[in-house]
Amino acid sequence: MIRRLIIIVVCVLICVANSYAQKKYALLVGISDYHALNKANEWNNIHGTNDVSLITQLLKKQGFNVSAITETKATRANILKQLKQLTHRVSKGSIVYLHFSCHGQPFEDKNGDEEDGWDESLVPIDAPIAYKKGTYEGKNHITDDVLA
């Protein structure tokens, strides 16, 4: 679901990137050091902040107003706050590019809206790797249901 959404957004972006009258906004999220907030976090480190740096340069050349959230600032609360703020800035005809360079993880679908029985989720820096009944049940993950 998230992959499809990203592909659609990228295709739309490519098709209209040279439109001169439209306002262009980008929100980029990148996490490299998943241990920065919690040394016991079991997620492997990746190169998300490098992706954000490279994509920021490209998008600014295309006239985008770029907001980036990286490392310890890439918490669930902050990502959702920035997404909400973005929805207030855009207007009809705006181009919006969303980019997430972080881990993803499937979650059992609880509301029955997924054919395959799984919700997809983004993994912010404050989300543990393991589901533990009564301790951590995915509350910091950002599921596709939340993004829809």
Region spans (language model):
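Positively charged n-region of N-terminal signal peptides that target proteins for export
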Residues: 1-5
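Bacterial N-terminal signal peptides
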Residues: 7-15
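Cleaved targeting-peptide boundary
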Residues: 20-28
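Caspase-like (clan CD) cysteine peptidase catalytic core
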Residues: 21, 76-101, 106-148
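Glycine- and acidic-residue-enriched helix-capping/strand-helix junction motifs
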Residues: 35-53
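Short helix-loop-beta junction
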Residues: 50-65
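Hydrophobic anchor at the start of a short beta-strand
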Residues: 65-67, 96
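Short beta->alpha junction loops
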Residues: 68-76
